[in-house]
């Protein structure tokens, strides 16, 4: 084995092979490595196969022309709630009394009458129309069998059912010589009928229910300033 001043532990020195200069050795260029596929890029390529790109999707799913089909705007929930919730109109006491008075006179109003009443009460014709519709419905429901009537609706129903019961009319009676004049030759017959009906002398007026009966001379007794006038029963009528 050839010894040298420098110990070498290479394979050639151990096998006693001649050393070759490193400059004369053929250089081996590194073989180009094939680029390894990036897993992220492979995943993106696979996803693109399932889903179209932005350009392709814009072509495929492009909406139709606005001129051919009107675009429907989604209604917001707030606007729907505002439409459902209508503001309740509060009528004043004077307006309510006038509406009730007119309802007792006339349940159905024509368009000119509604406009006239609305301008009088400073309301709109629609408000007057709705008030009359609601009041007719309440009155109809109150008249249904087994329904509890409110005082206002009951009074309104009584006014329409029997208007003559709430009005009393006093008919004047002409008296001649202490006897009522019935006109024509039937004075005695009328006097007898009045006595049988009223059970009082003909000079006394028939008392009405709820009113006290006054005699022939007691009418002027209520007014002391007119007591000097003669009693109506003593005045003789010249026919």
Swiss-Prot record:
SUPFAM superfamilies: Homeodomain-like (SSF46689). Keywords: Developmental protein, DNA-binding, Homeobox, Nucleus. The keyword DNA-binding applies. The keyword Cytoplasm does not apply. Residues 1-87 are annotated as: Disordered. Coiled coil: none annotated. Residues 1-11 have a biased composition (Polar residues). Residues 62-79 have a biased composition (Low complexity). GO terms for molecular function: DNA-binding transcription activator activity, RNA polymerase II-specific; DNA-binding transcription factor activity; DNA-binding transcription factor activity, RNA polymerase II-specific; double-stranded DNA binding; RNA polymerase II cis-regulatory region sequence-specific DNA binding; sequence-specific DNA binding; sequence-specific double-stranded DNA binding. InterPro entries: HD, HD_metazoa, Homeobox_CS, Homeobox_NK-like, Homeodomain-like_sf. It comes from the Eukaryota. Gene3D superfamilies: Homeodomain-like. Residues 84-143 bind DNA. It is found in: Nucleus. Residues 21-32 have a biased composition (Basic and acidic residues). CDD domains: homeodomain. Pfam families: Homeodomain. GO terms for biological process: axonogenesis; cell differentiation; DNA-templated transcription; epithelial cell proliferation; liver development; lung development; negative regulation of epithelial cell proliferation; positive regulation of transcription by RNA polymerase II. GO terms for cellular component: chromatin; nucleus. Its main location: nucleus. Belongs to the NK-2 homeobox family. This is Homeobox protein Nkx-2.8. It comes from Homo sapiens (Human). The gene is NKX2-8.
């Amino acid at each position: 084995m050839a010894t040298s001043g420098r110990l070498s532990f290479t394979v050639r020195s151990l096998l006693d092979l001649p050393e070759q200069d490193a400059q004369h050795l053929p250089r081996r260029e590194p073989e180009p490595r094939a680029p390894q596929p990036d897993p992220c890029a492979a995943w993106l390529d696979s996803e693109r196969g399932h889903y179209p790109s932005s350009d392709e999707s814009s072509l495929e799913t492009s909406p139709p022309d606005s001129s051919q089909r009107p675009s429907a705007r989604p209604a917001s929930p707030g606007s729907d709630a505002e439409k459902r919730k209508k503001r309740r109109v509060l009528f004043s006491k004077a307006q309510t009394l006038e509406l009730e008075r007119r309802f007792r006179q006339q349940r159905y109003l024509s368009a000119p009458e509604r406009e006239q009443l609305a301008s009088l009460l400073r309301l709109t014709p629609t408000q007057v129309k709705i008030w009359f519709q609601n009041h007719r419905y309440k009155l109809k429901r109150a008249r249904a069998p087994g329904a509890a009537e409110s005082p206002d609706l009951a009074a309104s129903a009584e006014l329409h059912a029997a208007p003559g019961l709430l009005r009393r009319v006093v008919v004047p009676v002409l008296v001649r010589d202490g006897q009522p004049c019935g006109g024509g030759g039937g004075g005695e017959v009328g006097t007898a009928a009045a006595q049988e009906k009223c059970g009082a002398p003909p000079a006394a007026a028939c008392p009405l229910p709820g009113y006290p009966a006054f005699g022939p001379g007691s009418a002027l007794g209520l007014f002391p300033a007119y007591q000097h006038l003669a009693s109506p029963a003593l005045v003789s009528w010249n026919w």
